[in-house]
């Protein structure tokens, strides 16, 4: 443990970023691939096509709800463990890991029960009634995905805990193993077995079981913060502090769910008013297309969040040890890297939308599908650089213990701006208004985030910056 602590406090910041961020990026990218790979194979199955794509778009926010709870537990535990180790409080760190395990299992079982009981109402709430085919496919996909929620949540919650224990490589491998299995099984179940949406969902769940099993294996062999038998219970005071640190991750994800629900319903409502998309055979196109755009955005944000979240143990330890100069250096490099990622994503979205669309089976679709998809990529993602910097700011504030500031900024972006503009702008611009909602939200959020960035730099240049 001492060697690990010394490494976090003395090694070059750039090297630490590579060691911790790269595995985290890969883990999140691979985790994102579960749903993205499903959508790619679904779209390229001629008997599913855009109806299956639209159904996947309907169900996707519901998996994000599970992810939101899992990352609140996992990221909160990760930050708490890192700060505790920086202060030399190993016992507290171990108790928090035990609490995280219990919380993730209990919450996943409750969520699964709710999903199975209220499935039809939930699907309708997220825009699944756009037409009969989409609703039917969404029902089938959602049922099997719900059965895998406990495994998915446990694996996602334990991933950052494993990183905090000092083994980001195993965290990456556990996620990668499940995703690879999913990629192998998807074409077999969808194309060979002709299982359709059920096949895509079953492949996903089997991959999630593998990831969860590897997480259990690691928990039994943890290096630094292995909990004892008495630690596997809910320690009230620790849970409160841990969840406070993870609340930003939760709100960031759950508010995205609210935004997606608003967007899906606005696409359904204003698509029904459009000359083309009001026709039954084209009604699912806006939802299917925006779902594809969101998958590309998810890939980019997985890189951005992975880069920032991977640095949480480094930031937490150095803040706990009072080494603010190192934290400031890391923040500077992080913002620069995130801006570069955003710039690359912007070039792809603006310059090569047709090629991106082709990955999701556009060859089987009408020209209306392709034309709307090109417009969606170029409009919805035109402020990717600011979106990436904003995300980095949210997570960094969380890492240094400023949970309230991070939470408020995240809520303003996703709920006040994201949901607000998704509901407001279509009233004036129709379907195009849905596409305008994201860039407008990112510009206004950056205005606020810029002030917080300046304030954070000032505090890191002075003595007495606080943690927790």
In which residue ranges do the predicted regions lie?
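Helix-terminus/linker motif at the lipid-water interface of multi-pass membrane proteins
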Residues: 29, 33-54, 123-132, 188-194, ...
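Transmembrane helical elements of multi-pass membrane transporters/channels
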Residues: 19-38, 144, 178, 207-211, ...
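Short alpha-helical transmembrane segments in multi-pass integral membrane proteins
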Residues: 1-21, 81-148, 192-247, 315-383, ...
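Transmembrane alpha-helix boundary and packing residues in multipass membrane permease domains
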Residues: 24, 28, 40, 79, ...
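Small-residue hotspots at the loop-to-helix junctions and early N-terminal turns
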Residues: 50-61, 138, 142, 201, ...
């Amino acid at each position: 443990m001492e060697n690990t602590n010394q490494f976090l406090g003395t090694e070059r910041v750039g090297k630490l970023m590579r060691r911790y961020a790269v595995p985290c990026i890969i883990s999140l990218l691979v985790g994102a691939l579960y749903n993205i790979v499903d959508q790619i194979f679904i779209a390229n199955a001629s008997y599913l096509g855009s109806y299956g794509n639209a159904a996947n778009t309907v169900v996707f926010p519901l998996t994000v709800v599970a992810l939101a709870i899992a990352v609140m537990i996992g990221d909160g535990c990760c930050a708490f463990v890192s700060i505790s180790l920086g202060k030399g409080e190993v016992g507290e760190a171990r108790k928090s890991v035990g609490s995280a395990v219990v919380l993730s299992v209990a919450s996943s079982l409750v969520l699964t029960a709710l999903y199975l009981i209220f499935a039809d109402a939930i699907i309708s709430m997220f825009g699944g009634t756009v037409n009969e085919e989409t609703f039917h496919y969404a029902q089938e996909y959602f049922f099997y995905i719900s059965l895998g929620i406990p495994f998915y949540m446990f694996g996602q919650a334990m991933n950052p805990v494993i990183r905090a224990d000092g083994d980001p490589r195993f965290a990456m491998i556990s996620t990668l193993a499940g995703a690879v299995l999913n990629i192998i099984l998807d074409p077999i179940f969808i194309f060979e077995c002709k299982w359709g949406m059920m096949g895509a969902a079953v492949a996903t769940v089997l991959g999630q079981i593998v990831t969860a099993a590897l997480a259990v294996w690691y928990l039994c062999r943890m290096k630094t913060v292995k909990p004892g038998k008495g630690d596997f219970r809910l320690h009230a005071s620790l849970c409160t502090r841990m969840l406070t640190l993870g609340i930003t991750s939760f709100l960031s994800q759950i508010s995205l769910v609210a935004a997606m629900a608003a967007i899906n319903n606005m696409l359904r409502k204003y698509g029904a008013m459009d000359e083309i998309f009001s026709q039954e055979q084209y009604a699912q196109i806006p939802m299917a297309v925006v779902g594809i755009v969101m998958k590309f955005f998810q890939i980019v944000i997985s890189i951005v969040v992975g880069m920032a979240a991977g640095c949480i143990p480094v930031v937490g330890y150095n803040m706990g040890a009072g080494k603010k100069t190192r934290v400031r250096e890391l923040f500077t490099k992080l913002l620069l890297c995130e801006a570069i990622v955003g710039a690359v994503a912007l070039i792809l979205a603006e310059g090569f939308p047709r090629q991106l669309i082709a990955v999701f089976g556009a060859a089987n679709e009408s020209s209306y599908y392709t034309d709307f998809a090109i417009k969606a990529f170029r409009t919805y993602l035109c402020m990717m650089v600011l979106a990436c910097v904003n995300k980095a700011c949210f997570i960094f504030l969380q890492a240094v213990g400023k949970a309230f500031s991070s939470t408020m900024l995240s809520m303003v972006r996703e709920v006040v701006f994201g949901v607000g503009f998704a509901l407001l702008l279509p009233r004036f611009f129709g379907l195009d208004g849905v596409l305008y909602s994201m860039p407008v939200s990112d510009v206004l959020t950056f205005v606020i985030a810029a002030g917080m960035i300046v304030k954070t730099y000032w505090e890191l240049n002075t003595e007495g910056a606080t943690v927790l």
